[in-house]
Amino acid sequence: MRKIIIDGRDFENIEVLHDDLKDKLDFPDYYGRNLDALWDCLTGWVDLPLTLVLKNFEFSNTFLGSYADDVLEVIQEAQEELKDEFKIIIE
């Protein structure tokens, strides 16, 4: 299973968060940089199986506020949808 690490200390703002996700998860150029587009790409674009490691997630909350929780919710819902093909680890 492929493993990708995302570090919450890197997310100064929402744009940087989405740019990092796009780059590390190899989303298409037309990725919309919003929660709906995140869901679409996680459930229909990324190569599976995949483990996504969210390091230093508490920093995401510091920089992004409640938006970090919204992103986490989308990622968790994708994990439920994709069963054993997509896993998240929060550190």
Swiss-Prot record:
Key word Cytoplasm present: yes
Protein name, as recorded: Putative ribonuclease inhibitor YrdF
Keyword tRNA processing: no
Alphabetized UniProt keyword annotations: Cytoplasm
Major site of localization recorded for this protein: cytoplasm
Domain of life: Bacteria
Compartments in which it is found: Cytoplasm
GO cellular component terms, A-Z: cytoplasm
Source organism per UniProt: Bacillus subtilis (strain 168)
SUPFAM superfamilies: Barstar-related (SSF52038)
UniProt family annotation: Belongs to the barstar family.
